[in-house]
Curated annotation (Swiss-Prot):
It comes from the Bacteria. One of its GO terms (molecular function) is flavin adenine dinucleotide binding. InterPro entries: Flavodoxin/NO_synth, Flavoprotein-like_sf. This is Protein MioC. Pfam families: Flavodoxin_1 (PF00258). Residues 4-143 form the Flavodoxin-like domain. Keywords: Electron transport, Flavoprotein, FMN, Transport. Its cofactor is FMN. GO terms for cellular component: cytosol. Probable electron transporter required for biotin synthase activity.
Length: 147
């Protein structure tokens, strides 16, 4: 089993790029990783460390590829008390639902007993053409919280 499972939800691929970049950085730091783009809940171990990275679609909506995961969290209320997670949202401050998807995912993970490690990073694409840059900066401090 990987030390850290990266879970991405993306409409245009931005969150996938961030997940893949952070997986490389985590491996350079000595962690083993598994990156899953739009996994189903049953694809995941109910323990360990998850890093959830999601863009926001439409009016604060979960990306289509992560909707089944989110809906399963809501409906099944799994016991995720053995999961620690970090969260990164990607969105545009042009919308009043800025990073609404990661807010929803974070809430459902906590409702299922998962413990958040660190603060959620919310990346405004208007300020960062390359969302991998602020995500990598955040990752350094997040790694320290895992120790």
């Amino acid at each position: 089993m990987a030390d850290i499972t990266l879970i991405s939800g993306s409409t245009l691929g931005g969150a996938e790029y961030v997940a893949e970049h952070l997986a490389e950085k985590l491996e350079e730091a000595g962690f083993t990783t598994e990156t899953l783009h739009g996994p189903l809940l049953e694809d995941l171990s109910a323990s360990g460390i998850w890093l959830v990275i999601s863009s926001t679609h439409g009016a604060g909506d979960i990306p289509d590829n992560l909707s089944p995961f989110y809906e399963a969290l809501q409906e099944q209320k799994p016991d995720l008390s053995a999961v620690r997670f970090g969260a990164i949202g990607i969105g545009s401050r042009e919308y009043d639902t800025f990073c609404g998807a990661i807010d929803k995912l974070e809430a459902e993970l906590k409702n299922s007993g998962a413990k958040q490690t660190g603060e959620t990073l919310k990346i405004n694409i208007l300020d960062h053409d390359i969302p991998e840059d602020p995500a990598e900066e955040w990752l350094g401090s997040w790694i320290n919280l895992l120790k």
